[in-house]
Design a protein with these regions (language model features):
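A conserved beta-strand element that flanks and buttresses the S-adenosyl-L-methionine
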Residues: 9
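Short conserved loop adjoining the S-adenosyl-L-methionine
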Residues: 1-3
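Conserved beta-strand signature within the Rossmann-like core of class I S-adenosyl-L-methionine
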Residues: 35-43
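Short alpha-helix
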Residues: 61-78
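Short catalytic micro-motifs in class I SAM-dependent methyltransferases
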Residues: 12-13
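Core SAM-dependent methyltransferase catalytic element
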Residues: 77-79, 83-103
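A short, conserved alpha-helix within the catalytic core of class I
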Residues: 16-27
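Short, glycine-/aromatic-enriched active-site segment of Class I SAM-dependent methyltransferases
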Residues: 43-62
Length: 103
Protein backbone atom coordinates (compact mmCIF):
# COMPACT_ATOMS: atom_id res chain seq x y z
CA UNK A 1 0.00 0.00 0.00
CA UNK A 2 1.19 3.57 -0.63
CA UNK A 3 3.00 5.54 2.04
CA UNK A 4 0.77 7.82 4.13
CA UNK A 5 1.56 11.25 5.53
CA UNK A 6 0.72 13.39 8.55
CA UNK A 7 0.55 16.62 6.53
CA UNK A 8 -0.12 17.25 2.84
CA UNK A 9 0.04 20.80 1.50
CA UNK A 10 -1.07 22.18 -1.86
CA UNK A 11 -0.62 25.77 -2.98
CA UNK A 12 -2.22 27.21 -6.11
CA UNK A 13 -2.91 23.83 -7.76
CA UNK A 14 -6.43 22.53 -7.20
CA UNK A 15 -8.33 25.09 -9.29
CA UNK A 16 -6.52 23.84 -12.39
CA UNK A 17 -8.31 20.50 -12.03
CA UNK A 18 -11.67 19.91 -13.68
CA UNK A 19 -12.96 18.12 -10.56
CA UNK A 20 -10.76 18.78 -7.51
CA UNK A 21 -13.15 16.84 -5.28
CA UNK A 22 -11.73 13.59 -6.72
CA UNK A 23 -8.14 14.29 -5.65
CA UNK A 24 -9.21 15.69 -2.27
CA UNK A 25 -11.18 12.46 -1.64
CA UNK A 26 -8.16 10.39 -2.77
CA UNK A 27 -5.87 12.33 -0.43
CA UNK A 28 -8.32 11.85 2.44
CA UNK A 29 -8.88 8.14 1.79
CA UNK A 30 -5.43 6.98 0.69
CA UNK A 31 -2.66 9.47 1.42
CA UNK A 32 -3.35 10.84 4.93
CA UNK A 33 -2.61 9.00 8.14
CA UNK A 34 -5.43 8.91 10.67
CA UNK A 35 -5.28 12.32 12.32
CA UNK A 36 -3.36 13.68 9.32
CA UNK A 37 -4.11 17.12 7.92
CA UNK A 38 -4.61 18.50 4.40
CA UNK A 39 -3.77 22.20 4.04
CA UNK A 40 -4.59 24.02 0.79
CA UNK A 41 -3.90 27.60 -0.30
CA UNK A 42 -5.79 29.20 -3.20
CA UNK A 43 -5.71 32.71 -4.63
CA UNK A 44 -8.23 32.01 -7.43
CA UNK A 45 -11.66 31.90 -5.79
CA UNK A 46 -14.95 33.74 -6.22
CA UNK A 47 -14.56 36.20 -3.35
CA UNK A 48 -11.17 37.33 -4.70
CA UNK A 49 -12.42 39.63 -7.45
CA UNK A 50 -8.83 40.34 -8.59
CA UNK A 51 -8.55 36.70 -9.68
CA UNK A 52 -11.63 36.68 -11.93
CA UNK A 53 -9.64 37.64 -15.05
CA UNK A 54 -6.82 35.13 -14.54
CA UNK A 55 -8.28 32.35 -16.71
CA UNK A 56 -8.50 34.71 -19.68
CA UNK A 57 -5.26 36.53 -18.82
CA UNK A 58 -3.16 33.36 -18.90
CA UNK A 59 -5.23 31.31 -21.34
CA UNK A 60 -5.57 28.34 -19.00
CA UNK A 61 -8.81 26.81 -17.71
CA UNK A 62 -9.33 27.53 -14.01
CA UNK A 63 -12.21 26.43 -11.80
CA UNK A 64 -13.93 29.31 -9.98
CA UNK A 65 -15.56 28.28 -6.69
CA UNK A 66 -16.76 30.17 -3.64
CA UNK A 67 -14.91 29.68 -0.35
CA UNK A 68 -17.89 27.81 1.10
CA UNK A 69 -17.86 25.44 -1.91
CA UNK A 70 -14.21 24.56 -1.25
CA UNK A 71 -15.07 23.92 2.41
CA UNK A 72 -17.94 21.66 1.35
CA UNK A 73 -15.62 19.63 -0.91
CA UNK A 74 -13.35 19.00 2.08
CA UNK A 75 -16.33 17.93 4.20
CA UNK A 76 -17.72 15.66 1.46
CA UNK A 77 -14.29 13.99 1.24
CA UNK A 78 -14.71 12.92 4.86
CA UNK A 79 -12.33 15.46 6.37
CA UNK A 80 -13.21 16.76 9.83
CA UNK A 81 -12.52 19.96 11.74
CA UNK A 82 -12.59 21.80 8.40
CA UNK A 83 -11.59 25.45 8.75
CA UNK A 84 -10.94 28.26 6.30
CA UNK A 85 -9.55 31.77 6.51
CA UNK A 86 -7.95 34.45 4.35
CA UNK A 87 -4.19 34.77 4.91
CA UNK A 88 -2.37 38.04 4.19
CA UNK A 89 -5.62 39.91 3.60
CA UNK A 90 -5.20 43.65 3.12
CA UNK A 91 -7.16 46.69 1.96
CA UNK A 92 -6.40 45.86 -1.68
CA UNK A 93 -6.04 42.06 -1.57
CA UNK A 94 -8.70 39.50 -0.59
CA UNK A 95 -5.97 37.23 0.73
CA UNK A 96 -5.04 33.63 0.09
CA UNK A 97 -7.93 31.31 0.88
CA UNK A 98 -6.55 28.66 3.23
CA UNK A 99 -8.60 25.53 3.89
CA UNK A 100 -7.60 22.72 6.20
CA UNK A 101 -9.19 19.50 7.32
CA UNK A 102 -8.20 16.51 9.44
CA UNK A 103 -8.68 12.83 8.66
Amino acid sequence: SPKKYDVIHSMEVLYYLEDPSKIIKKISDSWLNDGGRLIVGLDHYYENKDSHSWEEDVGTPMLMLKAKEWVRIFEMAGLEEVESWHANKSADWAGTLVITGKK
